[in-house]
Amino acid sequence: MERNTRVVKVANLKIGGNNPIIIQSMTNTNSADVEATVKQINNLEKVGCQLVRMTINNIKAAEAIKEIKKKVSLPLVADIHFDYRLALLAIKNGIDKLRINPGNIGSDENVKKVVEAAKEKNIPIRIGVNSGSIEKEILEKYGKPCVDALVESAMYHIRLLEKFDFFDIIVSLKSSNVKMMVEAYRKISSLVDYPLHLGVTEAGTKFQGTVKSAIGIGALLVDGIGDTLRVSLTENPVEEIKVAKEILKVLDLSDEGVEIISCPTCGRTEIDLIGLAKQVEEEFRTKKNKFKIAVMGCVVNGPGEAREADYGIAAGRGIGILFKKGEIIKKVSESNLLEELKKMISEDLENKKD
């Protein structure tokens, strides 16, 4: 199933429609610290981030946007809570997109002022609903955060922005409860055609957060829901990008990146397959080319079981084989497996250039 969402422009990016899914992250620096924030944004860009959000929690942070913009090339999103005037200041200083939280931005009149300023500069707004900060009235109606509460909050503010003749809208409905988050996105995707920003909020540390994000975001992407995403981890933001890229890669939603498949090992394994798989992953981790490598621990069954891989190695004690698309190419010594694999792939890629 595919959703045909409308397209919203954020600086030079197009989000929605048939455009590729955009990967986002968020800085964890003091936004007023220009040097530290610029350094982190540029590090995020190096690993594949395409859009960066930064908290604008005071006047100094809002004023820093102008200087930060001079030193980075990625579009920037201002994360606004409580004080609508900070949104106005962020717009004045050249922000590319706003994220407002309906639960704490204030009165409709405040929202109108933000919308008018954003419209004048062609700046899109993400309505970022969060299960932890749903409006008091809606929370009282439902008794606790739930799917319907998230959707009602989002729909109210979508209609409010539309009333002010504003349609450059992106929507998110985040929760730390994966099931609630998935159901909320599915429901709103049937109600509006605005691009959806996917994410599990407060997902947790690297391991748990990766699992929760892969399940929540992945389930929606399989349904054809989602136009941009952020994996939230209690970790260096660079790790968020690595996980996000992997999610897109395994769902065949990315045009680049090497996918490594490897067997889980069993009693037939006679080499350090875990170490070998990690070596292969590290060697090809940064490659832009799109292909699949199999690392198998059994020379008898390995090539056949990994037939869908473009390239592969299978190893026994002291000896291994190289294979392509399940067909054995040659036998090599165990110690030369990685080097021979690199050589085979490198030669293939060079031939494709010609």
UniProtKB/Swiss-Prot annotation:
Q: Which PANTHER family match?
A: 4-HYDROXY-3-METHYLBUT-2-EN-1-YL DIPHOSPHATE SYNTHASE, 4-HYDROXY-3-METHYLBUT-2-EN-1-YL DIPHOSPHATE SYNTHASE (FERREDOXIN), CHLOROPLASTIC
- Family to which this protein belongs: Belongs to the IspG family.
Q: Which species does the entry assign this protein to?
A: Fusobacterium nucleatum subsp. nucleatum (strain ATCC 25586 / DSM 15643 / BCRC 10681 / CIP 101130 / JCM 8532 / KCTC 2640 / LMG 13131 / VPI 4355)
Which enzyme class, named as a word? oxidoreductase
Query: Example GO biological process term?
Result: terpenoid biosynthetic process
What keywords is this UniProt entry annotated with? 4Fe-4S, Iron, Iron-sulfur, Isoprene biosynthesis, Metal-binding, Oxidoreductase
Instruction: Please spell out the taxonomic lineage of the organism that makes this protein.
Output: Bacteria, Fusobacteriati, Fusobacteriota, Fusobacteriia, Fusobacteriales
**Alphabetized Gene3D superfamilies for the sequence:** Dihydropteroate synthase-like, Sulfite Reductase Hemoprotein, domain 1
Q: According to the UniProt entry, what is the EC number of this protein?
A: 1.17.7.3
Co-factor requirement:
[4Fe-4S] cluster
Is the keyword 4Fe-4S assigned to this protein? yes
What's this chain's function?
A: Converts 2C-methyl-D-erythritol 2,4-cyclodiphosphate (ME-2,4cPP) into 1-hydroxy-2-methyl-2-(E)-butenyl 4-diphosphate.
Instruction: Please name the Pfam families in this protein's record.
Output: GcpE (PF04551)
> SUPFAM superfamilies given for it?
Dihydropteroate synthetase-like (SSF51717), Nitrite and sulphite reductase 4Fe-4S domain-like (SSF56014)
Question: Per its UniProt record, what NCBIfam families does this chain match?
Answer: ispG_gcpE, PRK00366.1
The coiled-coil segments of this chain are none
Annotated metabolic or biological route of this protein? Isoprenoid biosynthesis; isopentenyl diphosphate biosynthesis via DXP pathway; isopentenyl diphosphate from 1-deoxy-D-xylulose 5-phosphate: step 5/6
The note on cofactor binding and number reads: Binds 1 [4Fe-4S] cluster.
Tell me the protein's name: 4-hydroxy-3-methylbut-2-en-1-yl diphosphate synthase (flavodoxin)
Asked whether the keyword Metal-binding is assigned, the reply is yes
Question: Which residues take part in binding [4Fe-4S] cluster?
Answer: C263, C266, C298, E305
